[in-house]
Amino acid sequence: MKSNFYHLAARTAVRPAIRPILAGIAALSLFGAGLAHADVDASKSSVIATTKQMNVPVDGKFKKFSAQLNFDPAKPTAGSANVSIDTGSYDLGADDYNKQAQGKEWFDSATYPAATFVSSAIAPAGGNQYKITGKLTIKGKSQTVVVPVTVTAQGATQTFDGSLPIKRSQFDVGTGEWKDTSVVADEVVIKFHLVASKK
């Protein structure tokens, strides 16, 4: 039997809880994609993750993360990224939705308080394009991902833009009644825009 939360989500086209939760999973992989030896200005940056529930797209957002990063466009292959995301910091704009996101069927934040991305290689992809390969771990499940990034430099400021699709099922996010991908899409697509000041 579906939970009351399911019926609320099914009726609500503007702010269903599950779609933003799924969007957040994918965001985890992107913070390692371009915070290139710099401090990110959160007020000017955005990470928008989109998935679909019953064919309706919805966005979502993480509030806490830490990153140890090293990236020089002149020596991209020597760069590295090590990122930790607080899975309990995903904010859907309502306390009950946030608690749902932290629950066992989704991030299980009590058991897995952090999701991580650790780069293994950074490769030029032509012009100001780069591909960052690394291991993304969520709920104890790891997958190798390749994050495409566009880096733009203006004076002391760098911006990093890109998108990445992942499958929530590969990380056991959305289990039980939420495992049905005909209701909640398996694919999550992240678009990010990060603004940073060079150190």
Where are these regions (language model features)?
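Hydrophobic membrane-targeting alpha-helices
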Residues: 18, 29-34
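Cleavable N-terminal signal peptides
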Residues: 23-25, 34-36
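Bacterial N-terminal signal peptides that target proteins for export
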Residues: 3-24
